[in-house]
Design a protein with these regions (language model features):
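Flavin-dependent oxidoreductase catalytic cores
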Residues: 18-279
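Residues marking helix boundaries in flexible regions
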Residues: 6-9
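Short hydrophobic alpha-helical segments enriched in small aliphatic residues
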Residues: 11-14
Length: 279
């Protein structure tokens, strides 16, 4: 399990109207045996990132797309909805299954199932802020318990031979920010990638994304970090990368109805003109 940035440095830039200064980024990512051409990722969104939408975003320039979170509870693994979320579309060259749970053994079994179903990478959900999820001590609620988080990360990494990643928030609330600690645990467990949404669970989707907190995670680990939160334009994506020095950007709600946001932003990262939205 390994993940490194591609060795070629390209100039990433935005147009003057975007208000982003010139800066340098690595173009592309290598995750295990997979060389990915871009730096932009479709975020997992329940009820949105089904196979059809993932393929649309991949065709419009996303490096990879994360499926809807899949439950890890043994009593749920054989339900139709859960099995569908573990299923990888053959059109996805690099399929990613995200698993959700609070029991290390069940999460390990879920990771193994994802690999059996054809996933190229398993992503662990420590980021979902939904009340029904956190009420079961899952999603971002795990960030209140770094010991449990570490146990889950180690169990998942030990259960599969494919790359593993984790998506998290900056912490539970302003008084309990554990993203740096958990990112270090992920790195030590053998995870290849960390994605950070720049809000606490308490914020949910309100308030301002804290790019300083994301940058602290970037500085704390040697594995690539993907930045996430409130990216709806190419300029915002490039500014996120500039301010955080993240390896890439994960785009969620900004891609809904706007999948060409990926190709437009990646063109700028690669030093090419913005092709613009279709007319």
């Amino acid at each position: 399990q390994s993940c490194t940035m591609a060795g070629i440095v390209n100039a990433g830039f935005a147009t003057p109207s975007d208000g982003v200064n010139f800066f340098f980024v690595f173009s592309g990512m290598q995750i295990g045996p997979y060389q990915l051409a871009g730096n932009l990722v479709l975020a997992p969104m329940a009820g949105v990132t089904d196979a059809a939408f993932r393929v649309i975003c991949l065709r419009h320039g996303a490096a990879y797309a994360v499926g809807e979170m899949a439950a890890s509870g043994s009593h749920l693994l054989h339900t139709e909805m859960t099995r569908r979320r573990y299923t990888c579309d053959p059109r996805e060259r690099f399929a990613v299954v995200q698993i959700l749970g609070a029991d290390p053994a069940e999460m390990a079994n879920a990771a193994a199932l994802a690999q059996e179903c054809g996933a190229a990478m398993v992503d662990v959900n420590f980021g979902c802020p939904a009340r029904v999820v956190c009420g079961k001590a899952c999603g971002s609620a795990v960030m209140r318990d770094p010991k449990l988080a570490g146990d889950i990360l180690r169990a998942v990494a030990s259960a599969v031979t494919i790359p593993v990643s984790v998506k998290m928030r900056t912490g539970w609330d302003e008084d309990m920010k554990t993203s740096v600690e958990i990112a270090k645990m992920a790195q030590d467990a053998g995870f290849c990638l960390v994605t950070v949404h720049g809000r606490t669970r308490a914020q949910r989707f309100t308030g301002t994304v804290n790019r300083i907190d994301i940058a602290e995670v970037v500085r704390a680990v040697q594995i690539p970090v993907i930045a996430n939160g409130d990216v709806t334009t190419p300029g915002e994506a490039l500014e996120m990368m500039r301010q955080t020095q993240a390896a890439g950007v994960m785009i969620g709600r900004g891609a809904c109805g706007n999948p060409w946001l990926f190709s437009r932003t990646q063109a700028l990262i690669d030093g090419k003109p913005d092709p613009g939205a279709p007319t």
